[in-house]
């Protein structure tokens, strides 16, 4: 009789637990990996695609063997290929692997109190890309097209050496100032700690802006409005050569309306940079990764997002990624 009562109590306890879906219980629930919708494949040769898929599979294996999702489903997808018009003299193909941290959520609309579902969207993601830096106006392993409106790329922060890689900085990208503030943390893994881009000098930048302004004047006609900016450019070009060889640090929205350079660290400024084609081994097939970027994007204030992101970071091995370069 006592055994029957004990079994009944245990059954009731488990039944109660099964009916009680809470945020706290779901946070501890073992998660799962799931292949999500796969992205496009464009302008990639069959031979290169085979090699690129092998690289992505190695990245997935690295992360999935070192990290077990908890309280979420991790959806992952891939993209291979490029728009040929986005660069010129392509050296390597861009391709990438993306992870989406999808939380388990209690279904408050269901009469079944134990029911939960997988969220359909997330602000918390991980991207590991080969041969492209998306945060740098899409720097590719190629030159800038001749018809590019700008003629250079905009870098927000100086890269810094850290943990065997280049830390490209962090940036708030959503929910600014809120508990759920969304931040990106960007890393770059390269050959011999070199960079696939170089800094444009003030002189180079001034010449680019002068040409753009001259084109605008030809199309729209001269005016006092444009003439004052041309005067600013010509005045800067008369400075000492040592000043003109300094990196161009510019106000973000002050390109064709040139008023002057700013100092490093000025809010709302950028470094003008260009692809460094001498960085690359041009004898390698386009499928070879010649640099990787790793971007962690996480929404703060949610333990599932924060704990899973911390675990992912431990699984992403920068040394292993560096060892893949050129292979």
Predicted regions and their residues:
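Surface-exposed amphipathic alpha-helical segments
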Residues: 294-327
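Feature detects long, helix-prone N-terminal segments enriched in hydrophobes
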Residues: 283-288, 302-306
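Boundary of Sec targeting at the N-terminus
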Residues: 18-19
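Short, solvent-exposed recognition patches
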Residues: 31-279
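Acidic/histidine-rich, surface-exposed loop or edge segments in extracytoplasmic proteins
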Residues: 23-40, 288-301
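Sec-dependent N-terminal signal peptides
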Residues: 3-14
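Generic detector of short, well-ordered, non-transmembrane alpha-helical segments enriched
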Residues: 14-15, 312
């Amino acid at each position: 009789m006592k055994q029957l009562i004990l079994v009944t109590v245990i059954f009731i306890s488990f039944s109660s637990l099964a009916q009680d879906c809470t945020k706290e219980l779901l946070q501890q629930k073992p998660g799962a990996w799931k292949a999500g919708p796969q992205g496009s494949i464009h302008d990639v040769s069959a031979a290169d695609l085979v090699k690129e898929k092998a690289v992505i599979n190695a990245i997935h294996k690295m992360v999935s063997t070192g990290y077990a999702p908890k309280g979420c489903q991790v959806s992952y997808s891939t993209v291979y290929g490029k728009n040929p018009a986005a660069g010129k003299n392509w050296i390597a193909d861009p391709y990438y692997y993306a992870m989406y941290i999808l939380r388990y959520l209690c279904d408050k609309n269901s009469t079944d109190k134990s029911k939960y579902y997988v969220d359909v969207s997330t602000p918390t993601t991980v991207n590991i890309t080969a041969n492209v830096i998306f945060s740098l106006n899409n720097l590719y392993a190629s030159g800038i097209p001749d018809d590019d409106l700008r003629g250079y790329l905009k870098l927000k922060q100086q890269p810094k050496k850290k943990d065997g890689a280049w830390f490209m900085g962090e940036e708030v990208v959503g929910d600014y100032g809120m508990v759920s503030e969304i931040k990106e943390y960007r890393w770059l893994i390269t050959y011999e700690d070199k960079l696939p881009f170089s800094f444009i000098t003030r002189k180079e930048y001034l010449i680019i802006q002068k040409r753009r302004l001259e084109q605008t004047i030809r199309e729209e006609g001269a005016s006092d409005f444009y003439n004052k900016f041309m005067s600013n450019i010509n005045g800067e070009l008369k400075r000492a050569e040592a000043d003109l060889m300094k990196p161009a640090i510019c106000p973000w929205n002050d390109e064709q309306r040139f008023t002057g350079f700013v100092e490093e660290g000025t809010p709302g400024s950028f470094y003008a940079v260009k692809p460094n084609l001498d960085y690359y081994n041009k004898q390698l097939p386009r499928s070879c990764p010649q640099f990787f970027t790793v971007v962690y994007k996480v929404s703060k204030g949610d333990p599932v997002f924060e704990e899973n992101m911390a675990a992912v970071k431990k699984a992403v091995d920068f040394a292993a990624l560096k060892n893949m370069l050129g292979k």
